[in-house]
Amino acid sequence: MSYQITINNNTTSNVQNIVIADPNLASLGENVVFSDSQGPLSSLYVYDGVWVIKLRSPLSPGQSITITASSGTPNIDPTIALYYNNGSSYSNLTLVGSPTVSIVQDFGGYAISAYASGDFFLVASPTGFTPSSSRLLVVDRWATTPTSLDAVGLRLYADTNDWFGVVRKYVNGAQNVSIEQKISGTYSVVNEIDISQFAAFTDPLVMYLSINGSTANVKVYKQGSNIGTVSGNYSTTPYGNPSMAGYGTVDKHYANFIVLPYEPDPQVTVTPISSPSPTPTPTPTPTPTPTPTPTPTPTPTPTPTPTPTPTPTPTPTPTPTPTPTPTPTPTPTPTPTPTPTPTPTPTPTPTPTPTPTPTPTPTPTPTYDITYVVFDVTPSPTPTPTPTPTPTPTPTPTPTPTPTPTPTPTPTPTPTPTPTPTPTPTPTPTPTPTPTYDITYVIFDVTPSPTPTPTPTPTPTPTPTPTSTTSSNI
């Protein structure tokens, strides 16, 4: 990912060392190269998303320039700062350039441990440090979770040696942090900078102390966003060194300290540079996908074709009389496959589901609606009921269509039959071999002729004849 950075010098001074704090850059980490039209620029890494960039030449008031930031090897130049450390050492900072400046840190036994026990950073200027021409950029980088502490403070101090200190303390890992108004101790705190408005800090927290003349401007950055600015005066009136006693100890952590020549901050805008070109390429790919979709459409069409397959099965109906016994599965198929099947072919689509129900229905009565049937299955006697099958074939074709519609009318006319289909599936496996078995006991629920009348099939069949014949057979 690359970013475009526009720097607009809306100040009244020349600017060359630009401080950029932006969350977009944080995704690139420390491997960021900044370039203008002539190539890479010098830069100094502060923290993820926070950099100091040195322009090739000062930018005059009213001018603007556009540079880019992208992943790559940074062109680190420590001389950008008056002094700088890389955040990995607890020793005094290496001096870069002039004037003579030193930094003192208390991380458990360093130079000013006699003055305090706590978490703080101090910039000391025994000689040659002119606050009006310098600014301090501090980034705190925790290595471990801080111990139980109760407040956070950012303070500016001044004593006989012009000590300037930044003091920070955390609560629950910098969650729900409150700003402390005062620092207790034996020595007075001079012109403390009040940043109580900056509540609820979270790491990483970038503190930018800009010292210009007698005014100290503090900018607090959280995740690269400028939370706000407050100002306060400082004094060089002789005071004793400020006491930090009573603040407890904290876990060790790393910190980057950078002191820069003072310059006002120009307007900086960071925007992502995206390349949507590749996106459209995959778009056409989905277009061909719909083409294969129609192919499966014809596949369902053959589904009805297998339905007629059972049609030839009815012809050998007499022969398969014994066959049903071993194979209950095929039995239901032949029963609903009467010659008239072609006509109700469209209806058969739902037939597969009710197939078990019609099996018993066709055998007993074409005209009557079977509500409940109990069968006594006997193996050998099958041949004996030969006379029964004789009438059966005739009605068989008729019922076949009937079974298909039967499930439909049954629930409609008689509310009682509605539950009947539920039990019917249970006996269905038994009745499957109806032609093979001898029916010992049958209970029929005879419905008036009108029921079959709605079915076109019963009309051609002589209604009276089958009725009496079936009764005599039973």
From Swiss-Prot:
Gene source species: Thermoproteus tenax virus 1 (strain VT3)
Disulphide bridges: none
PANTHER family: MIGRATION AND INVASION ENHANCER 1, SELENOPROTEIN W
Record lineage: Viruses, Adnaviria, Zilligvirae, Taleaviricota, Tokiviricetes
Region named 3 Thr-Pro repeats regions and two near identical repeats: 278-467
Residue segments, region Disordered: 268-474
Sequence repeat residue intervals: 368-377, 437-446
Record's compositionally biased regions (Pro residues): 275-365, 380-434, 449-465
Sorted UniProt keywords: Repeat
Positions annotated as Thr-Pro(N) repeat: 278-367, 378-436, 447-467
InterPro entries per UniProt: SelW_related
Protein name per its UniProtKB record: Viral protein TPX
The keyword tRNA processing appears for this protein: no
